[in-house]
Amino acid sequence: MLHLLYALALLLLLCGACAILAERFTLSPALLPLPVLSGAVVVLYLCGVAGFLRVGAVAVLLALAAVWVVGLVQYRPAGVAAAWKRAASVPGFTLFLGGAAFIWLLFCVQQPMFTQWDEFTAWGLAPKMVVERGAFYVADPVNLKASFTYPATSLITFLFQPFGPWAEWACLAAIDTLALACLAAASALPRERWAGGVLVFAAGFLLPFFFSATPTGSYAAQYVNAMADLPLAMLFGGTLCLYFAVGRRKIAYWLVALPLAVLTLTKDICFAYGLITAFLIGLDLWLAADEPCRKAFPKALLRAGALAVIVLAAFSSWGRYTAAVTPTADTAASVGSEGLSYGAVLVGGVKQLLGMGRTEKFAQIMAAMGSAFFTRRICLLGGGIMAVAAITMVAAAAWLAADRGAPRRRVLAAHLGFAFCFAALYLFHLILYNYNFSDLEGLALKDYDRYLAPYYQAWMLAMLCLLAHGARERLAQLAAGGAAAVIFAVFCWRGVPAAGFWSGADSLYTLRADVQNRADTMNTVLGWPDRVLVISQGDDATRWYYYRYELTAQVVNGFGGFYGRLGETQDRWDSDFMNLVESENWTLYDYKAVCVPDTLVAYMAEKDCDYILIDRADDYLQREFSPLFEGGLTNDMPATLYHFEGADAAVPFTLAAVAESGVE
């Protein structure tokens, strides 16, 4: 409940500041939630790099409160109330505030949890560690696998829970709040065009479902996950929509820099998305200017270049910070198992695109990428060709609704610029599939829809925004209504999930809850400096990753291969989880590590482990390993934590904690 009260108070503080700032600078209040939230994230980022993350949270709260104080002094309470009233009449602002409050209330009641593997390896683990430790996860010695994630989603989460205990549902609500702020910028229309604003907001909200390969009737996690896909799509599209609304004003133009910096800090690929955003803005400043293109070019180049510098600064600062606090080989900027630099990958990829030294793998992936654009489902209408066709129809309507001259050039430049950058991004992913994935994953185009759907979403959102802002008001409103109606109709026809953010999903959390209950018992004994080896016989990695996320300790990686004799480590390799077996031809488990009692003890000593957690045992552990453990082992034993007394102890593993559970 405290999380909810704090979040609602912060929303009230933020929206009040937006209303006052809108009054001061004569801007639409719907435009300001995105730059204000982004500004808060930037402040937290700078303070986090300096090692004072919670000080940054206090600074953000004081800054928002200061806006209220200045507003009350300058405009008097009656003036602030009038500013609130005017802000509430703007559809984008009201929908943002109401939608965000609804999400927080709903999630507080439903308590949704993480469900996807990547949330437990990085995207959910990282914000959890930031909230619990009050510092960036890369500066923390625990669970450093989260260090490859970028900090934006962790920081927006921390903004909404900087002082209290960690809550997964609050993380999910915070990310959705950022997404709604992006939609508010896209739907920032005056009161008299409220219908257009509502339609753009509603259509934009459905876009993550529209550009989705989720099977019909399944659970839709678009607004209930901590992955960076939703923030990436919304920030990319929302930043451009913000620019389309304020870009011609000298001071307000630089508001775009704040969400652009946050976009860059969202994911590694967002460096490319940030540069694409700067390019599209520069293209608009050049081709859609009121003055001749030749005269507009230098100014457009300078402004776009300045935004590109911001992107580069944000991207490089995170890389330098990560390298400084974790000076290991894993933090180097490299691609694939060969450790090639980004430059080498790009040069090699371009050469192969041009036919120079093209490998068979590259040729096969290139053919698969070409076919996937037409055949691989990326939206509710089908493949990428259908997505581009739908977006082009909206762009054509926006062009018709715009005035002749610069407004029409703006729509044309934006759409063609998006198309050009999409082609470049598509080729870039072709190169990544060749260099950054195994042969099997590359040829299968692993996560193809996840990588490209955010671009389609942002492209469509930008075109909807331009359509709603069309000067021919009646035509624009009718066309926007038609586009929103089509999106809604297709969603109802082919994409309505069986469950989503609006419904509970308790059946998805059964295994999570089981591991969580067991981990709670272990955490009464464990502390962050402790190192724990987790064994769960028959696991497919799911339970191991859950424990790695839940335990308040350092979970030690296991091994794969053969380690059946002391001193013979040449046939084993580093892994994460492991199933212990007695021979390499063991067929009971798909993932196995040959291990005997002596080598288990040796491995514990080698990895400096303090504890071993036997989550699930089997006949092999009961038969061969029981003498090592106090009280022995049984194949039906509850999850049990043992303290490692050392390799020379008569009984190396002594009882530390026992957890009961009815779920297996």
Which residues fall in each region the model found?
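Short periplasmic/luminal acceptor-recognition loop of GT-C membrane glycosyltransferases, typified by
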Residues: 522-572, 615-618
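Hydrophobic/aromatic-rich transmembrane helices and adjacent perimembrane loops
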Residues: 128, 228-235, 272-273, 423, ...
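Signature aromatic-anchored transmembrane alpha helix within multi-pass, membrane-resident enzymes
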Residues: 251-260, 297-311, 467-498
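Membrane-interface alpha helices of multi-pass inner-membrane proteins
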Residues: 43-48, 240, 252-268, 272-279
